[in-house]
Amino acid sequence: MRIALIAHDKKKDLMIQFTKDHEDYLSNHTLYATGTTGTRIMEHTKLKVNLKKSGPLGGDQEIGSMIANGKLDLVFFFRDPLTAQPHEPDVSALLRLCDVYDVPLATNNAAADLFIKHLKGK
């Protein structure tokens, strides 16, 4: 499975904990992430992550392109809904593409945990 990992700044620590908690499962899949998120994940885990640009520098658009081209199967995007993002149009476009192309999307830790638990059960 091809999985994207994205987290806004205030959610990066939560994403790192999520990847630590599910490292065994995630290590069996191809992972992609925006630059800063992916770098931090690799610093704190043994996971191999294919890096895109940082979100505000076009990374969200790169992930969106992967969705539109059928190159992603699942997106974990830990969003910070309480902080305005300078690249909010890119974020909205990425979320829209998940809906258009029917790619499962978890935008918080609880949903992401449920996805992993379900996938492990298969």
UniProtKB/Swiss-Prot annotation:
Native source species: Acholeplasma laidlawii (strain PG-8A)
Catalytic activity: dihydroxyacetone phosphate = methylglyoxal + phosphate
Family: Belongs to the methylglyoxal synthase family.
Cysteine disulfide partners in this protein: none
Gene Ontology cellular component terms for the protein in this record: cytosol
GO biological process: methylglyoxal biosynthetic process
Superkingdom of source: Bacteria
Enzyme Commission designation: 4.2.3.3
Gene Ontology MF terms: methylglyoxal synthase activity
Record InterPro entries: Methylgl_synth, Methylglyoxal_synth_AS, MGS-like_dom, MGS-like_dom_sf
Residues annotated as the enzyme's active site: D60
Residues annotated as domain MGS-like: 1-122
Keyword annotations of the record: Lyase
Protein name in the entry: Methylglyoxal synthase
Native organism taxonomy: Bacteria, Bacillati, Mycoplasmatota, Mollicutes, Acholeplasmatales
Annotated residues for binding of substrate: H8, K12, T34, G35, T36, T37, S54, G55, H87
Signal peptide: none
